[in-house]
Amino acid sequence: MSMLCYTLIIAFLIGIWAAPKSEDNVPLGSPATSDLSDTSCAQTHEGLKTSRNTDQRHPAPKKAEDQELASAANIIVDPKLFQKRRFQSPRVLFSTQPPPLSRDEQSVEFLDNEDTLNRNIRAKRETHPVHNRGEYSVCDSISVWVANKTKAMDIKGKPVTVMVDVNLNNHVYKQYFFETKYRNPNPVPSGCRGIDSGHWNSYCTTTQTYVRALTMEGNQASWRFIRIDAACVCVISRKTENF
């Protein structure tokens, strides 16, 4: 009986010794482990290549400001917006080319060809002839047509987006604003020209007004009153006498 038990135990040990070792029990540095490492590195490299290709096919989204400007350029303005001329200002002009240096005092205009532009300049010269009388203003001002105004403050004090280009009846017009401001941004110590500095304090400054301009609200164009530079004035105050 004891011999039979010894024989079974020996046969069992021989079977365990002869059984092949699994890959999970292979020691570090063996050929099986090297194959697994190579396979893992290859899969990681392929994953990185796939990620780079995906990024190239799907670029990063554009900024919100760029999208807003692009959408504003594609907005088609309804011609009905220009039928009511009640609040239109002579300081706002829609034109396909740069306007003349002097503004017309009539109303909002559309200049779409050179003949119209030349007629406007001739009419302005005939209406306001130049006189050399040595006339001087109390403040030196400068007036320009502003072509690329994109931001402004509305009548409620909120920032709004101003439309630069207006697509109307398949024609692209640019919105111009005639602005007047003080030529020197820094106040002059001597004050305004022609003011008695012995009795008055004076300085030149720029004042603003509201004009009706075409602005962008969401994906639609709408009229709003915005604030622009309108004039250069002299501010004076009486000097207090010290006794």
From Swiss-Prot:
One of the protein's GO biological processes: nerve development
Residue spans of biased composition, Basic and acidic residues class: 47-66
Glycosylation sites: 148
Assembly notes: Homodimer; non-covalently linked.
Annotated propeptide span(s): 19-125
InterPro entries named among the record's database cross-references: Cystine-knot_cytokine (IPR029034), Nerve_growth_factor-like (IPR020408), Nerve_growth_factor-rel (IPR002072), Nerve_growth_factor_bsu (IPR020425), Nerve_growth_factor_CS (IPR019846), Venom_nerve_growth_factor (IPR020433)
Signal peptide per UniProt: 1-18
Cystine pairs: 139-204, 192-234
Subcellular location: Secreted
Tissue specificity of this protein: Expressed by the venom gland.
Biological role stated in the UniProt entry: Nerve growth factor is important for the development and maintenance of the sympathetic and sensory nervous systems. It stimulates division and differentiation of sympathetic and embryonic sensory neurons as well as basal forebrain cholinergic neurons in the brain. Its relevance in the snake venom is not clear. However, it has been shown to inhibit metalloproteinase-dependent proteolysis of platelet glycoprotein Ib alpha, suggesting a metalloproteinase inhibition to prevent metalloprotease autodigestion and/or protection against prey proteases.
Pfam families: NGF
The protein's name in its UniProt record: Venom nerve growth factor 2
Keyword line: Cleavage on pair of basic residues, Disulfide bond, Glycoprotein, Growth factor, Lipid-binding, Metalloenzyme inhibitor, Metalloprotease inhibitor, Protease inhibitor, Secreted, Signal, Toxin
GO function terms (MF aspect): growth factor activity; lipid binding; metalloendopeptidase inhibitor activity; nerve growth factor receptor binding; toxin activity
Native species: Pseudonaja textilis (Eastern brown snake)
